[in-house]
Design a protein with these regions (language model features):
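Cell wall/extracellular polymer interaction/catalysis modules
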Residues: 1-31, 35-37
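Exported/periplasmic cell-wall-interacting domains
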Residues: 31-37, 44-119
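Active-site donor-binding loop signature of nucleotide-sugar glycosyltransferases
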Residues: 24-26, 42, 75
Length: 119
């Protein structure tokens, strides 16, 4: 579950116990992350992200949660490398997270896993 107000992604096991809490950066005010219930549609170990004003190749550990692949959960090494902390809205709508957490989530989340994004 992604909580937009707390800028955290909480992972639960099948018994609804918290397994991991991950700091994230979701969409900034001008490009907000939508609130919705979905699932993991596609997974890419590395992919290129495209937007109106950007192209970012090699985005690691990407899991798309919208059928059109517009909203994804992924690592943001450029944010880490720039020293910009997670927990602050910074994206164009995706859910960014540190590389180590994105790697873990990618390897522990199969396609079809339900995803909730809430305010």
């Amino acid at each position: 579950m992604v909580d937009l107000s707390d800028q955290r992604l909480t992972v639960y096991n099948s018994d609804q116990e918290v397994v991991r809490v991950i700091p994230v950066s979701t969409g900034k005010a001008s490009t907000p992350t939508p609130i919705f219930n979905s699932k993991v549609y596609t997974k890419y170990r590395s992919t290129t992200m495209y937007g109106r004003t950007y192209t970012v190749p090699g985005v690691p550990f990407t899991m798309c949660v919208s059928a059109n692949e517009a909203i994804c959960l992924h690592a943001a090494p450029w944010q880490e490398n720039a020293g910009k902390p997670f927990g602050v809205p910074r994206s164009h709508g995706c859910v960014r997270m540190p590389l180590n957490h994105a790697r873990w989530l990618f390897h522990n989340t199969p396609k079809g896993t339900p995803i909730t994004i809430q305010a």
